[in-house]
Regions:
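Extended catalytic cores of very large enzyme megasubunits
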Residues: 1-364
Length: 364
């Protein structure tokens, strides 16, 4: 039985070679006394076929070790060490080489970033510490691998430390190398971490770095669809969105322009639900929309049912997140078991614009 090494050459493989490699990795991790190394090696050998690549064997070993984490935490340490070591062998050795490869083969790095890269590449290549990659556990690394590390087509180019240095160079490249390296050290030593959009887009020509956006909705067809379009654009660049819909007229309210009746907020929210699914965050994770409604809105009961997995599914929107804006007056009425009245915002004008004493005066 032969395997294909990374240089393309064939090499005979045996149980002894497999167990030796796993023992060497375990030794580099301090021994891993909780791991049955022979058992792992036997499982690997049962999956070997003629012509399998050594990088594929490493991935398989990592998955098998990760599947046994419930037996002992040391299996997780072994799994992360194997897959990260494998990833480092499959990528270029210097930060500058990787960034230049990305710049010349994709559109994910800006000209300004590339200029700063050329200016500081020697200092950065000398400073970056790839051993810090091994501080990530298996599942953390797999998350980075799936969504955060930059690729050329489907081939991952970055290592975790490259991602952190890319962020640092983008944010501080114009203020000098000292700030770049300081930021990198803080990030790589896990003193703090930037938000996901920053990790996704730092260095790109369209560097949308913000996590959260809050949007209101106008009570008209034009206003509703403008807000949906804005949400789609924000989600495209990995932003999470909070939308307040309390000023949208309730079900069965009069539409004066057509003399018809409104269907309320539920059909509209189903469009938001579809938008969140269709326009995911930079193609890397699902869109995230949170919908806010005040407790006096006449559609509040239907709103509270939107997340239920039973009942009339035409009145459900399962992929959105929901929250109520609750006033002090509402909680006072709850405590006293008093009447609470519901309104459509086109009839109770101004309630969405006030709070505190002003809200209580207008509501009462």
């Amino acid at each position: 039985m032969r395997v294909i090494k990374r240089n393309g050459k064939f090499e005979d493989v045996s149980f002894d070679k497999v167990i030796r490699r796993i023992r060497n990795i375990a030794a580099n991790c301090g021994g891993l006394n909780g791991v049955e190394l022979d058992e792992i090696a036997q499982k690997i050998c049962s999956h070997i076929f003629d012509g399998v690549k050594t990088s594929e064997l490493d991935e398989l070993t990592g998955r098998l070790a990760a599947s046994m984490i419930t037996h002992h935490p040391d299996y997780g340490v072994l799994a992360s060490r194997i897959v990260i070591s494998n990833h480092q062998k499959n990528t270029l050795n210097t930060f500058s080489d990787k960034m230049m490869l990305l710049y010349h083969n994709t559109e994910c790095l800006s000209n300004e970033f590339y200029t700063n890269l050329k200016k500081y590449k020697n200092q950065i290549d000398k400073h970056i510490d790839y051993d810090r990659d091994f501080s990530y556990d298996y599942f953390a690394f797999k998350t980075l691998e799936k969504a955060y590390l930059l690729k050329i087509k489907s081939k991952i180019i970055e290592r975790p430390q490259d991602m952190l240095m890319r962020v640092s160079l983008f944010l501080h490249g114009n203020t000098g190398i000292d700030k770049v390296l300081q930021c990198y050290n803080f990030l790589s030593n896990k003193y703090f971490i930037h938000a996901t959009p920053t990790l996704f887009h730092a260095g790109s020509p369209k560097s949308q770095l913000l996590s959260c956006f809050l949007i209101g909705t106008e009570d008209s067809i034009k206003g509703i669809y403008k807000t949906i379009t804005d949400c789609a654009q924000i989600s495209k660049w990995a932003g999470g969105i909070g939308v307040h819909v309390s000023n949208i007229r309730a079900s069965n309210s009069l539409i004066r322009g057509t003399n018809g009746r409104s269907d309320g907020i539920i059909p509209m929210l189903k469009v938001y639900n579809s938008t969140a699914l269709f326009v995911n965050q930079s193609g890397k994770r699902a869109g995230s929309f949170a919908i806010y409604l005040e407790t006096w809105h006449a559609d509040i009961f239907e709103f509270l049912d939107l997340k239920k997995t039973h009942g009339d599914m035409e009145k459900r929107a399962l992929d959105l997140f929901y929250a109520m804006w609750i006033s002090d007056l509402f909680m006072e009425r709850v405590e006293k078991d008093e009447m609470w009245s519901l309104f459509s915002p086109d009839e109770a004008k101004g309630l969405t614009d006030v709070y505190g004493d002003e809200f209580e005066e207008l509501y009462v």
